[in-house]
Design a protein with these regions (language model features):
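Anionic-ligand binding patches
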Residues: 2-12, 16-200
C-alpha cells in the first residue's frame, strides 16, 4: 500500500478539547470531519498503552465511517503515583468528564503519598499517541511527550483536562495559564503531530 497524501480525515474523538487542538494542527487544505453526525459510542480502551488505545480507536472509527481516521490517546503520568493516572487519565474524570474532580483526585493522592509535596518538584509528563488508520492507508502510530512538574494548586482556565496543574519544563506557568498559540508549539500533541505531518 502506498502512502498517499491525506486530503480528508475523520478525527476519532468525542472530546471537544482534543478535537479543537488536533484540528488546529492539521493543514488547512485538508478536509477535517468530526464524529458529530455519528451515534456510535466510544470503543472500550482495552490496551495497556497509549499507542495501543490510539490505534484501537483509529481502526474503530475508520471502519464505522469508511474513511481514513486519526485518533488520539493521551494522558498525564506522575512519577510519585507510579505513573498514574496514565492511560486512565480520562476515566479519573468520571462519566461526566469532570476534570475538576480528576484534578482533586490527583492532589488527594499526591497528599496521601507525601504531605510535604508542595516543598518539592513532583515530576510528571504528558504523553500523546496519534494513530492513522484507513483501509488503503498504511497504518501510522506515533507518540510525543513533554516533561514537567505538578503545580502546587490549580492555575489558569485555558486548555482542558489536567492543563491547570501541569507546568512544562523550562516554563513557570501551567498549560492552563498559557495562550493556545504558545501551548501548541511545545506540547505533547504537537510533538506527536510533527511525526505525522508529512502524510498530509
Amino acid at each position: 500500500m502506498q502512502r498517499q497524501k491525506i486530503r480528508e480525515i475523520v478525527i476519532g474523538t468525542n472530546n471537544k478539547g482534543k478535537l479543537r487542538e488536533i484540528r488546529d494542527l492539521i493543514p488547512k487544505k485538508v478536509k477535517v470531519l468530526s464524529l458529530k453526525n455519528t451515534t456510535a459510542k466510544s470503543p472500550k480502551e482495552t490496551s495497556k498503552t497509549f499507542k495501543g488505545n490510539a490505534l484501537l480507536k483509529a481502526k474503530y472509527y475508520s471502519k464505522l465511517t469508511g474513511k481514513i481516521c486519526l485518533a488520539d490517546d493521551s494522558g498525564l503520568e506522575i512519577d510519585l503515583l507510579n505513573k498514574a493516572p496514565g492511560i486512565y487519565s480520562a476515566r479519573w474524570s468520571g462519566k461526566k468528564n469532570n476534570f475538576n474532580l480528576a484534578i482533586k483526585k490527583v492532589i488527594k493522592k499526591i497528599n496521601l503519598k507525601d504531605k510535604n509535596w508542595k516543598k518539592r518538584n513532583i515530576k510528571a509528563r504528558f504523553k500523546c499517541a496519534l494513530a492513522i488508520y484507513g483501509t488503503d492507508f498504511k497504518t501510522v502510530n506515533v507518540i510525543g511527550k513533554i516533561e514537567g512538574t505538578i503545580s502546587k494548586k490549580k492555575l489558569g482556565s485555558r486548555g482542558f483536562g489536567y492543563d491547570p496543574i501541569f507546568i512544562p519544563i523550562g516554563k513557570k506557568i501551567t498549560f492552563g495559564q498559557m495562550r493556545p498559540e504558545m501551548k501548541h508549539k511545545i506540547d505533547h500533541r504537537f510533538k506527536a503531530f510533527k511525526k505525522i505531518r508529512k502524510f498530509f
